[in-house]
C-alpha cells in the first residue's frame, strides 16, 4: 500500500507493505551521502537486510542505542560530529531505522544538520506507525520528554511490516496503545471492532490482522496532521492519553505505550468528573488486563511528582494543564483541568487497584 500526504506542497509517500525496504535503494542515488542511523536492537536482528544498501560507497551506518536512551544531548552531539566529519553537503540523507525514539532522534539530527537535510523514516515497530508520520522530531530534556524538537517532514516513510515478526511482546503492547488510541479517535464502533478483534493476549501476540489496523491508524493520523500540521487545533487530539501518560512514562521509566494506556484510562476518569460522562472505567481496565498490560505500578503513582511533569506538557498555556478528553465518542475536546480535579482523578484511578 502506498499512501501520500496531501499538503499544498512538499508532500511525501508512505509505503506500508511487506518488503517495503526495497524502496530505499530508489532514493540512495539521489543523495551525495546517506547515513543509516539504526538502533542496536534492529541491527542485531536485521543487519543483513541492509547489506546491499551499505555496499554503496556513499552510504554509512551509525549504530545508536535503542529506545529513549538515544534521545539525549550527548548522543545528539556525538552523532552530529561523526556525520560532519564526512564533509557532508545539504544533499545528504539521514535514514532512521528503528522504533519511534530512533525516528524522533534521527529526524532532529536531519532537521538541524546544515539547517536541514533529507530524512527518510524506516520504522520497525508498531509504535512507530504513529510517530513516523506527521513530522514531529526531537530529543528529551531533564525537564521532560520531547521538549526539544521541531516539525520536520520526511522525504519518505518506508514501513516494512516484516520487521514486526521479531518484536518482543512488551513492544507489541507498547505499540498497540497508539493503534488503540487511533481507534478511540475514530469513534465507538471502531473501538468496539478492535476490542473484539484483539480480545486477549494470545490474539494480540499473534499480530493476526494487525496490518489492517496499522494502515487504518496511519490514515487517521494523516487526515489530522494534514489539516493541522503545527498542532494549533485538531492535531492536539493525537495527544489523547499523553498528558498523564508522558508523566508516568518519564517518572516510572516504563514503555511509552504502557504509559499511554494508563493515560487513556485517566482521561476517562477526568472526563467523567468534568462532564458527567458515563465512561465505564472498569471495562477499560479489564480490557488492558486481558491483553496483558502490567498495571501494578498504578498503586505507586505519586500525584505531586507526576503533576510537576504534567506542568511541562507542550499543550499547556498560561492557564495551566490542558488535556485531550473524550467527552463522549465523537466529541473530543482540549480542556484546561485544575489541579484538584487532576489529583482526585489520580486517587480514583488508584482505588481500582487496591
Swiss-Prot record:
Record note on cofactor: Binds 1 divalent metal cation per subunit. Can use either Co(2+) or Zn(2+).
Cofactor: NAD(+); Co(2+); Zn(2+)
GO biological process: amino acid biosynthetic process; aromatic amino acid family biosynthetic process; chorismate biosynthetic process
UniProt-listed Enzyme Commission number(s): 4.2.3.4
One annotated Gene Ontology cellular component of this protein: cytoplasm
Pathway(s): Metabolic intermediate biosynthesis; chorismate biosynthesis; chorismate from D-erythrose 4-phosphate and phosphoenolpyruvate: step 2/7
Pfam families linked to this entry: DHQ_synthase, DHQS_C
Keyword list, A-Z: Amino-acid biosynthesis, Aromatic amino acid biosynthesis, Cobalt, Cytoplasm, Lyase, Metal-binding, NAD, Nucleotide-binding, Zinc
Enzyme class: lyase
GO MF entries: 3-dehydroquinate synthase activity; metal ion binding; nucleotide binding
Binding, Zn(2+): 178, 242, 256
Catalytic activity: 7-phospho-2-dehydro-3-deoxy-D-arabino-heptonate = 3-dehydroquinate + phosphate
Keyword set includes Aminoacyl-tRNA synthetase: no
Main location: cytoplasm
Subcellular compartments: Cytoplasm
HAMAP family: DHQ_synthase
Its job: Catalyzes the conversion of 3-deoxy-D-arabino-heptulosonate 7-phosphate (DAHP) to dehydroquinate (DHQ).
Family as reported in the entry's similarity comment: Belongs to the sugar phosphate cyclases superfamily. Dehydroquinate synthase family.
Protein name as annotated: 3-dehydroquinate synthase
Species of provenance: Staphylococcus aureus (strain MSSA476)
Amino acid at each position: 500500500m502506498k499512501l501520500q500526504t496531501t499538503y499544498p506542497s512538499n508532500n511525501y509517500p508512505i509505503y506500508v507493505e511487506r518488503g517495503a525496504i526495497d524502496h530505499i535503494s530508489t532514493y540512495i542515488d539521489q543523495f551525495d551521502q546517506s547515513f543509516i542511523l539504526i538502533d542496536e536492537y534492529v541491527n542485531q536482528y536485521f543487519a543483513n537486510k541492509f547489506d546491499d544498501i551499505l555496499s554503496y560507497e556513499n552510504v554509512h551506518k551509525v549504530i545508536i542505542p535503542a529506545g529513549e536512551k538515544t534521545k539525549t544531548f550527548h548522543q545528539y552531539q556525538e552523532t552530529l560530529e561523526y556525520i560532519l566529519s564526512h564533509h557532508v553537503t545539504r544533499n545528504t540523507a539521514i535514514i532512521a531505522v528503528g522504533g519511534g525514539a530512533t525516528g524522533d532522534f534521527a529526524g532532529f539530527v536531519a532537521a538541524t544538520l546544515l539547517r536541514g537535510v533529507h530524512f527518510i523514516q524506516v520504522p520497525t515497530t508498531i509504535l512507530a506507525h504513529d510517530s513516523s508520520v506527521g513530522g514531529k522530531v526531537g530529543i528529551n530534556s531533564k525537564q521532560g520528554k520531547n521538549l526539544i524538537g521541531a516539525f520536520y517532514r520526511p522525504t519518505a516513510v518506508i514501513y516494512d511490516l516484516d520487521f514486526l515478526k521479531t518484536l518482543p511482546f512488551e513492544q507489541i503492547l507498547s505499540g498497540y496503545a497508539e493503534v488503540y488510541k487511533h481507534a478511540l479517535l475514530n469513534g465507538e464502533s471502531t473501538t468496539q471492532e478492535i476490542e473484539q478483534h484483539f480480545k486477549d493476549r494470545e490474539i494480540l501476540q499473534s499480530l493476526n490482522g494487525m496490518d489492517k489496523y496499522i494502515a487504518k491508524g496511519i490514515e487517521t493520523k494523516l487526515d489530522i496532521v494534514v489539516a493541522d500540521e503545527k498542532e494549533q487545533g485538531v492535531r492536539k487530539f493525537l495527544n489523547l492519553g499523553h498528558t498523564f501518560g508522558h508523566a508516568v512514562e518519564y517518572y516510572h521509566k516504563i514503555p511509552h505505550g504502557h504509559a499511554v494506556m494508563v493515560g487513556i484510562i485517566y482521561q476517562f476518569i477526568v472526563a467523567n468528573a468534568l462532564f458527567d460522562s458515563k465512561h465505564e472505567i472498569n471495562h477499560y481496565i479489564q480490557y488492558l488486563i486481558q491483553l496483558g498490560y502490567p498495571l501494578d505500578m498504578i498503586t505507586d503513582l505519586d500525584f505531586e511528582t507526576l503533576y510537576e511533569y504534567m506542568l511541562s506538557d507542550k499543550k499547556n498555556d498560561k492557564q495551566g494543564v490542558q488535556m485531550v478528553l473524550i467527552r463522549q465518542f465523537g466529541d473530543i475536546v482540549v480542556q484546561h483541568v485544575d489541579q484538584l480535579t487532576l489529583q482526585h482523578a489520580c486517587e480514583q484511578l488508584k482505588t481500582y487497584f487496591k
